[in-house]
UniProtKB/Swiss-Prot annotation:
Residues annotated to bind 1-deoxy-D-xylulose 5-phosphate: R45, H50, T100
Site feature location: Transition state stabilizer: E151
Organism: Christiangramia forsetii (strain DSM 17595 / CGMCC 1.15422 / KT0803)
GO cellular component, as recorded: cytosol
Pathway stated in the Swiss-Prot or TrEMBL entry: Cofactor biosynthesis; pyridoxine 5'-phosphate biosynthesis; pyridoxine 5'-phosphate from D-erythrose 4-phosphate: step 5/5
Protein's name according to its UniProt entry: Pyridoxine 5'-phosphate synthase
Amino acid sequence: MTKLSVNINKIATLRNARGGDVPNVLEAAKNIESFGAEGITVHPRPDERHIRYADARELKPVLNTEFNIEGKPIQQFIDLVLEVKPAQVTLVPDAENAITSDSGWDTVKHRDYLKEVIAEFKANGIRTSIFVDPVKKMIEGAAETGSDRIELYTESFAVDFEKGNSNAVKPYAECAKIAHELGLGINAGHDLSLKNINYFKENVPYLDEVSIGHALISEALYLGLEKTIQQYLKLLK
C-alpha cells in the first residue's frame, strides 16, 4: 500500500498568521498520526515563513511515524537534517522567492553536487529522495547521484487532470517504471488531492509514498482532519 505522509506547513502558516502557538504544530502532528497517517513532512525555508527550524527539532522526539524533511540543501538546511536525523530527507531546488516548489532538479547539471550531499546524508543513516519532473533523463540522472528515491513533481498531472486530460498520468507511469528498473524508490507530491489521488495511484506503479499538504489541509476545513485523512488512506489502499 502507498503510504501517506502529511505535510504540515499550512498548519504552521496559520499559526504564524497571528503569532503565538495556535494551532500547535506538535499537537497537530500527533493528531494526524493518530488519525492514521504514516508520516509527517515539513519543508522549512530560510525565511521560516511557515515551518521553523525549531519546529523540526521539536517534532522529531514526539513523532511515532516516519519524519520527512524537505528543502533546498543550503548549509543551514544540511546542518538541520544532520542534527535531527529524520527517516528521510527530500532535496528540493527551491527558487529564492518562490511561493511554493515549482520545478524538479536538473539531475544532470547538478549531479556532482547532489551526489556529495546525498553521500553525507546516507552516511548518517538518512534515506534520501530527490524532487524531479517526470522526465526520463532526470530520472536516470537521479539514479547516478546515489539517491534512494525520487519524488515525482505532480503539479502538471494535477492541472491537466482537472481539465479532463486523463493521459496526464502517462509520463509519471513511464518514469515510475524507469525508476524502479534503476533501483529507485518512488514518492510523489504537489497538488495531489482527494479528486485525483486514486487515479494517480492506480495508474502509477511502484508508488511508495505520497506527500500531501495544501490540498489535505484545505479539504479538512470542510470534512474535518480525521475524516479527510481516512478518505486518503482508503483511496491509497
